[in-house]
Amino acid sequence: MLSTQFNRDNQHQAIIKPSLLAGCIALALLPSAAFAAPATEETVIVEGSATAPDDGENDYNVTSTSAGTKMQMTQRDIPQSVTIVSQQRMEDQQLQTLGEVMENTLGISKSQADSDRALYYSRGFQIDNYMVDGIPTYFESRWNLGDALSDMALFERVEVVRGATGLMTGTGNPSAAINMVRKHATSREFKGDVSAEYGSWNKERYVADLQSPLTEDGKIRARIVGGYQNNDSWLDRYNSEKTFFSGIVDADLGDLTMLSAGYEYQRIDVNSPTWGGLPRWNTDGSSNSYDRARSTAPDWAYNDKEINKVFMTLKQRFADTWQATLNATHSEVEFDSKMMYVDAYVNKADGMLVGPYINYGPGFDYVGGTGWNSGKRKVDALDLFADGSYELFGRQHNLMFGGSYSKQNNRYFSSWANIFPDEIGSFYNFNGNFPQTDWSPQSLAQDDTTHMKSLYAATRVTLADPLHLILGARYTNWRVDTLTYSMEKNHTTPYAGLVFDINDNWSTYASYTSIFQPQNDRDSSGKYLTPITGNNYELGLK
């Protein structure tokens, strides 16, 4: 039994003991494995390596993907820059979080803010949403809910489409779309993998990935992925503890119908995380240098996150070459943190801190602050689409059309306090032994709800054997309600691409894609500014 309580004081215990994790998961699946086969006297030996993986799990590529257009195509057929990071590559390169995947993906750069926060960019713009199974979640860099810390053991692959991706996401920056594809129960026999890892900075990591049929014919299958990780860091006092779990059931309801349903849980507890960086400059204008272990985090600082998601997918095949897909999800992400930052210059003579605003007058001599932030992000989303092929003028073409609805509520609370030079003393002697703030009650910092309704369609027309034209569009109705205003915008996002197959191995393409981003600023007459539009013109060779 897992029991969690999100808020904590100065101490907390691990949610689940790592030594029990693999055993609990295995015991959960063993009854179903026994039920699926007649009882025998044979001895079953479980070794540390998995059985033969499903087709594609041991490869760096996939045969087809819906990235970019939602139509199943090869990467060569997509008129945009696409990278697929497969499960095998993530295992080989030890890419264990979404952030680590993005750091190792072509065309994506990283700006590290502190120990746990990083911003990711593509083509000069910040990536401001992530997708799971094609359903986007939008986030603000102001609030750190741990999206980039999602554990990759729960996912089959990550699809990255660079540039404007309005056909897929609706709103956002013309940077990139990141789509995480969940693992499913694909095996009709019991199989799995249990691993343990030990490394620098007292790192220990345990992961179990088990599959089993729930019926004798294997038409109903289950997959459980669970893990635990604990590690320190080169930073003084820092410790991170993570527990993650995903359970999914896949059922073949008939020859043409498949239903999947599952639950995902992640919890990340960080002790003594930094909030911003170290003081860069001295009062005389010279720069500081520090040991890399140096940290501004006090002993009591923490940053905890908890993720709960339920999800469902229904797929129905019909007319031989057509398939309808319904994806639905409900997710709740909570965070609670108490942290401290330093924003000051250092007096080289005695190590005392001098605030950057001291010349503003009395009360402006503070050199940093503490913050108690907490909140929840809730997302409810539906996505229904159909894709398939049709014949016209003696040639085969592809068509995709559908609609989506999402509701996202962000509700955050804060309490702040300033820190003055005498409280810290000489920064040269700072070792984290700093008294915790006498916190004032939290106040509401943000409460908004965003509704997005979309209709979209795209087609891939074969103009000649080597020449393919892709046309598409997405119509989006976007509305946000906050404590002080409401705003609604409608926007149509076009998509066009042309792909020419040079030979069996090479293609060249040209494309125009777009995306839009609503603004909450107003002009002098009080009207909201028109949305920012991002346009992407691209030529490429694959």
Stretches found by the model and what they are:
Residues 252, 377-379, 396-400, 404-408, ...:
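Structural signature of Gram-negative outer-membrane beta-barrels, strongest in the C-terminal barrel
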Residues 82, 90, 101-102, 158-163, ...:
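Non-catalytic regulatory/gating segments with a bias toward low-complexity or hydrophobic composition
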Residues 110, 119, 135-162, 181-182:
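Short acidic/polar hinge/loop motifs at secondary-structure boundaries
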Residues 194-198, 224-228, 261-265, 326-330, ...:
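Transmembrane beta-barrel strands of outer-membrane/channel proteins
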Residues 138-139, 154-156, 167-247, 253-257:
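Outer-membrane beta-barrel translocator/receptor signature
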Residues 229-233, 246-317, 332-377, 422-444, ...:
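Acidic/polar loop-and-plug regions of large Gram-negative outer-membrane beta-barrel proteins
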Residues 36-87:
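Short, acidic, small-residue-rich periplasmic hinge/interaction motif at the N-terminus
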Residues 61-83, 93, 99-136, 156:
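Extracytoplasmic beta-strand/coil segments of soluble accessory domains associated
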